[in-house]
């Protein structure tokens, strides 16, 4: 599972309740991980961290024969696509919720500003100077949930750091330029009223991807935070769609006989399919202690929930 640990906690519970083992860690500098807050020096380092961590879980005996799915929201969707690019045959599929295939023009700095910032990124990489609109206001529709997010001290709410913003921009461009290379099964979910990441680029991913098994669902009137910022009835609908998609693909032996689903155009945690969910505390060193996080170089024990 790749995304924001605070926002994805409830998502992990939903998937675990549906019978899936859910794993994740904080990105470096995010959540409870070490490092400068929300500073990304190189996006590829973040992807490498995710790759090592998730594969270490998949190599454990109890999960070795399970189907493996990526789950990514927003920036985590870009991470999921880059993990697939890094090892195209490893993952059995991905759920991509409002993926960062392209940053919306409505929150992106003016091109002239980007040019100026690029010239000083190696001099002041950690400065919080990138002008941008308030993403929390733009992402979370439900006012009560929005205020809850604002009050959480683990949620970064300053201006983006210079290097971080430029890395996100470069990554989104790279992802957008390589949409045709995506070959794994995937399910894209995107709010049509999203002003943070562009739903039209999600549609382009669906159209250009080489995947034989691909599904997209666009939700009229919904914003960026589909699983954490919408009214409860919308959140329930989104999770119902996610679990239904995973359930149809969670057995490898059945995958070969599946027919590709039709796209729902009218309307990327790693999950180990059918892993038992136990209410007991995990054994020391057991993977079951990890739930709903992001990637980072921090000790994964910090992310135990």
Predicted regions and their residues:
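Catalytic nucleophile-loop/oxyanion-hole region of alpha/beta-hydrolase
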Residues: 4-7, 11, 31-67, 232-237
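Conserved alpha/beta-hydrolase
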Residues: 12-35
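Short beta-strand/loop motif that positions the catalytic acidic residue
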Residues: 182, 188-190, 194
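Short alpha-helix in the alpha/beta-hydrolase fold that links the catalytic acid
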Residues: 184, 198-207
